Amino acid sequence: MNRRTFLATTVIGSLATGIGSAAAAAERYFPLKVDPALFESINRVKIPGKKSPLEMSHAPLITAPKSVKAGELFTVEVSVGERVHDMGPAHWIEYIELAIGNEPLGRIEFQPRGFMKPKATFSVVLPKDVAPSGVVTLVALQRCNLHGLWESTLDISVG
């Protein structure tokens, strides 16, 4: 074996070992598998009375008064899941959005380090013209890095 072949073999072997080690480390750091089907559309709870564990930890939970007065301030809280979703570098909630129907109200973005819990509080005032029928639908969206986009709705009456 000449020197050139020896050096080339050594370099290629070292690179292969380094890449293999990096891939193994990434698999240990990000061990969760992603279900691509969860990213094809908006996910919603299928049977409200019988939520799956995935639905219980990913469907946004909207907490708001059942009835509000037009022009008066009220609070809407959106948390991710009945059991609040864990936050960490391998699995986290990217954002929470709140809308009235198709009208966006606000968005809170999260980072994956886990400093914050996926909960957002919105202060809302609804003018009378927003609810000609006397009812509005609050729509909460959240996106999980591994389980896609989830949506929940809540109807409230506006007097």
Where on the chain are the PLM-derived regions?
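Structural beta-strand segments of beta-rich domains
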Residues: E72-V76
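Short acidic/polar inter-strand loop motif in beta-rich domains
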Residues: R143-T153
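C-terminal segment of N-terminal export signals and the immediately downstream linker at the start
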Residues: G20-I62
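Short coil-to-beta strand junction motifs in C2/discoidin
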Residues: G88-E94
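Short amphipathic, basic-aromatic surface patches that mediate peripheral association
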Residues: S79-G88
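Solvent-exposed serine/threonine-rich low-complexity stretches and specific carbohydrate-binding patches
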Residues: L105-F115
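Exposed aromatic-hydrophobic patches
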Residues: P118-P127, T153
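N-terminal secretory signal peptides and thylakoid transit peptides that target proteins
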Residues: M1-S14
